[in-house]
Amino acid sequence: MAAQKPVRHSVHVKKGDTVQVIAGKDKGTVGEVLQVFPKTSRVLVKGVNLRTKHVKPRQEGESGQIVVEEASIHSSNVQLYSTTQKVASRVAYTFTEDGRKVRKLKKTGEIID
């Protein structure tokens, strides 16, 4: 049986956004989005969902390493975070007076873009 394709949802965060994790073992952690994977609706957040990877030595005489790196989490488990108000909020999309579409935090009304 063939593997099912993941359902694509629109991702509400972009690279460089500050987000707070709202579910999982790192709940409450605030970090910066390093990378977004829109096809699988996943994001890579700095300092969240850390995994240890054992790397074999590549050349003779070189020693192996244990590397700690971030693993991706689903975008539904993060909310945009306001650094000024210190609160996480859902996102609303609105238009400015000049016609640009911008993201706005629902709790504070702060415009992100």
Swiss-Prot record:
Entry's Gene Ontology molecular function annotations: rRNA binding; structural constituent of ribosome
Segments traversing the membrane: none
PANTHER family: MITOCHONDRIAL RIBOSOMAL PROTEIN L24 (PTHR12903)
Gene behind the chain: rplX
Record text on subunit structure and interactions: Part of the 50S ribosomal subunit.
Name of the protein in its database record: Large ribosomal subunit protein uL24
InterPro entries xref list: KOW, Rib_uL2_dom2, Ribosomal_uL24, Ribosomal_uL24_CS, Ribosomal_uL24_KOW, Translation_prot_SH3-like_sf
Keywords for the protein's UniProt record, in alphabetical order: Ribonucleoprotein, Ribosomal protein, RNA-binding, rRNA-binding
